[in-house]
Regions:
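Transmembrane alpha-helical segments of polytopic membrane transport and secretion proteins
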Residues: 1-25, 249-267
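Periplasmic/extracellular loop-to-transmembrane helix junction in inner-membrane transport proteins
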Residues: 37-83
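Transmembrane-helix boundary motif in ABC transporter permease subunits
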Residues: 80-110
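Membrane-spanning helices that line or support transport/gating and their immediate boundary helices
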Residues: 94, 101-108, 150, 154-157, ...
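Generic hydrophobic transmembrane alpha-helix motif, especially the helices
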Residues: 111-146, 153-154
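Transmembrane alpha-helices
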Residues: 137, 141, 174-206, 235, ...
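Short cytoplasmic-facing helical segments at TM-TM junctions of multi-pass membrane proteins
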Residues: 150-189, 221
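Hydrophobic alpha-helical transmembrane segments of polytopic membrane proteins
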Residues: 217-253
Length: 267
């Protein structure tokens, strides 16, 4: 019986772009007329949002920071924390997947931390860190476990017969790791990275809301919320969503191109 593995869908695949643009246009029209009907400063329409976007992009905020400064401030912190999560999560996931005894003996120590949300660490992060290390630490906590878990689960699905074949032919443990385990687990790692990127992006916005920086989309939204400037707040929200969407699509595109074979119909 033929079975097709579930595959991730990109918003940029052929045919999808048109439908996405039509949906976006319809949503903007509904939003525009709803704002006209309500006529409230607390429910601005897309025209006012566009005006606020242009002001922020061209002139910056009251501190002289442009919209791009805020966007890059958040993105830079995410990339640093995410990078550390990849560098630690992948090797540890491989180790725990290959050494079942080690995983069993340390599971009760490691696993409880998976259920502590990153924002719960904010008070400790404020006490022990400042600047970039504070945000990188929080982002790392949000991104680490999706990568670690996906890698660990991927290793557990490697067929033992594949390892035995290489062992029979005299392959070393390192060769088995690099030629059998890692290539097999890479698709799972990429899947975990996409989940981790979403968690990291959510974490940075929450972390920036607590202060400790004058640059960042979360910080920008708080500053304008205190001034009751709703259009500027919504600009920040939309940018958070747009950047997160682009990052996810970039990882998804890389995953589909590198591991096209995984989504083929198999017997």
């Amino acid at each position: 019986m033929n079975q097709a593995s579930p595959k991730p869908q990109s918003a940029f695949r052929p045919g999808a772009v048109t439908y996405n643009l039509l949906s976006l246009a319809a949503g903007l029209l509904v939003w525009h007329f709803a704002a006209l009907a309500v006529a409230s400063p607390f429910f601005p329409g897309p025209v006012k949002i566009l005006d606020a976007f242009q002001r922020l992009a061209m002139g910056g905020d009251t501190m002289g920071n442009s919209l791009w400064d805020h966007s890059w401030g958040s993105l830079h912190r995410v990339l640093v924390g995410f990078g550390v999560a990849v560098l630690l999560g992948v090797p540890l996931g491989l180790l725990m997947g290959l050494k079942e005894g080690l995983y069993i003996s340390t599971r009760s120590i490691i696993e409880p931390f998976r259920f502590i949300p990153p924002i719960a660490w904010i008070p400790l992060a404020i006490i022990f860190f400042s600047g970039l290390p504070r945000f990188a630490f929080l982002i790392f906590l949000g991104a680490f476990f999706p990568i670690y878990t996906a890698t660990h689960v991927g290793v557990s699905r490697v067929e033992p017969i594949h390892r035995k074949v290489f062992m029979v032919h005299g392959a070393s443990k390192f060769q088995i790791l690099t030629r059998v385990v890692v290539p097999t687990v890479l698709p799972d790692i990429f899947g975990g990275m996409r989940v981790a990127m979403g968690a990291a992006w959510l974490t940075i916005v929450a972390a920036e809301l607590t202060g400790g920086t004058s640059v960042g989309l979360g910080r920008m939204m708080v500053d304008y919320a205190e001034l009751l400037k709703i259009p500027e707040v919504i600009v920040g929200m939309l940018l958070v969503g747009a950047i997160g969407f682009v990052l996810n699509e970039a990882l998804l595109l890389a995953e589909k191109r590198l591991f096209r074979w995984r989504w083929q119909v198999t017997l």
